[in-house]
Swiss-Prot record:
InterPro entries: Ig-like_dom (IPR007110), Ig-like_dom_sf (IPR036179), Ig-like_fold (IPR013783), Ig_sub (IPR003599), Ig_sub2 (IPR003598), Ig_V-set (IPR013106), V-set/Ig_domain (IPR052871). This is V-set and immunoglobulin domain-containing protein 8. One of its GO terms (cellular component) is membrane. Its main location: membrane. Residues 22-262 are extracellular. Residues 284-417 are cytoplasmic. Residues 1-21 form the signal peptide. PANTHER family: V-SET AND IMMUNOGLOBULIN DOMAIN-CONTAINING PROTEIN 8. It is found in: Membrane. Keywords: Disulfide bond, Immunoglobulin domain, Membrane, Repeat, Signal, Transmembrane, Transmembrane helix. PROSITE patterns: IG_LIKE.
Length: 417
């Protein structure tokens, strides 16, 4: 009994030392996936038991344990004797600090800012008083997926096979590819719209959906549509994701019917052929009108047909003959006209001179200057009306002597040629 009692007394005396006086709240180990460029808080809140409220100093250390085989520990932040110190990791000195202004107030958490892929490691928090407590956080920093490229391969006609291609040229592996039909007649492929691992809106959680897409064998980003038809029309969205983010691209599938396309092409070609024939016919009519405009009748000097029809003067200067079949009023030899003129105070001779000046023929020129000039005869005319036939032919310009002869030619039936 004496030996047993002594042993029991020894265990009672040593029990406070065997108990942990410093305790850190939370799990002993945490795994985190973080995106490049983000900020994170690595928690390390702790408690001190009454046995540890003595005068012993409080020491806090944060160290980085690399995943190398050596598992080298690098202390990068400390708190000792109410002083904060930075360790031997210069690339972390400007990006890490304690979350609390006084870490001795039961909070040894730190803020790590502007994360880099090289920050992937295991971070360990150690709080020492009379005893020591530790906590580890496994941090994996990844780059978000780059914006992918989407395209199709294959002819989009009814009954053919089409491959939808999707590829992201950036982002940390592993990358998962998920296709979803976002518009059209049906939705055979379910889409998951999410911005981060904490806001994944779907029937499945973010992690479950991520691993399920990997198991579906869509790692290469290809989706095969076999024997496409009108039901496959629509927009297809490719989502590239990893543990820290996602990116999307959209491609359109529009199935065409080969027979319908042939009909449309035939209709277009037929319309063009009809338009060409119509234009050719109009051009032929214009050429015929310009070339045979004189068939409707003879044209005068100014392009007007005298015997019927209007000549096309714009189509060319053609020689023409003018035939006037009209009866001119006769000039009777009675003295009634002379009496009227005497009554009006105009002698016959003066009237003849005034008319001669008014209706004098123009100077001799080309064929286009020929004109018919009515003139009152000074001599006596034969009684009774009689038809007058005048035939004017294009000729070379006459000289002035001929003009004088025409001026002095005797009149017949009251008209001067």
């Amino acid at each position: 009994m004496g030996v047993r009692g002594a042993l029991h007394l020894l265990l009672v005396c040593l029990s406070p030392a065997l108990l942990s006086a410093v305790r850190i709240n939370g799990d002993g180990q945490e795994v985190m996936y973080l995106a490049e460029g983000d900020n994170v808080r690595l928690g390390c809140p702790y408690l001190l038991d009454p046995e540890d409220l003595g005068t012993n100093s409080l020491d806090i250390e944060w160290m980085q344990v690399n995943s190398e085989p050596s598992h080298r520990e690098n202390v990068f932040l400390t708190y000792q004797d109410k002083r904060i110190g930075h360790g031997n990791l210069p690339h972390l000195q400007q990006r890490v600090r304690f979350a609390a202004s006084d870490p001795s107030q039961y909070d040894a958490s730190i803020n790590l800012m502007n994360l880099q892929v090289s920050d992937t490691a295991t971070y360990e928090c150690r709080v020492k008083k009379t005893t020591m407590a530790t906590r580890k956080v496994i941090v994996t920093v990844q780059a978000r997926p780059a914006v992918p490229m989407c395209w199709t391969e294959g002819h989009m006609s009814k009954g053919n096979d089409v491959v939808l291609k999707c590829f992201a040229n950036g982002g940390s592996q592993p990358l998962s590819y998920k296709w979803a039909k976002i518009s059209g007649h049906s939705h055979p492929y379910r889409a998951g719209a999410y911005h981060s691992q904490h806001s994944f809106h779907s029937e499945l959680s973010y992690q479950e959906s991520f691993h399920s897409t990997i198991n579906q064998g869509l790692g290469n980003g290809d989706l095969l549509l076999k024997g496409i038809n009108a039901d496959d029309d629509g927009l297809y969205q490719c989502t590239v994701a990893n543990h820290v983010g996602y990116s999307v691209c959209v491609v359109e599938v529009k199935v065409s019917d080969s027979q319908r396309v042939g009909m449309i092409v035939g209709a277009v070609l037929g319309s063009l052929l009809m338009l060409a024939c119509l234009a050719l016919g109009i051009w032929g009519l214009i050429c015929c009108c310009c070339g045979g405009g004189g068939a409707g009748g003879a044209r005068g000097a100014f392009g007007y047909g005298v015997g019927g029809g209007v000549g096309g003067g714009a189509c060319g200067d053609l020689a023409s003959e003018i035939r006037v079949d009209a009866e001119a009023p006769g000039c009777k030899a009675s003295g009634r006209g002379s009496r009227v003129t005497h009554l009006l105070g105009y002698p016959t001779q003066n009237v003849s001179r005034s008319l001669r000046r008014k209706y004098a023929p123009p100077p001799c020129g080309g064929p286009e200057d020929v004109a018919l000039v009515p003139r009152t005869a000074s001599a006596s005319c034969e009684a009774g009306p009689s038809p007058v036939y005048i035939k004017v032919k294009s000729a070379e310009p006459a000289d002035c002597a001929d003009c004088a002869q025409v001026e002095q030619r005797s009149c017949k039936d009251g008209l001067l040629v």
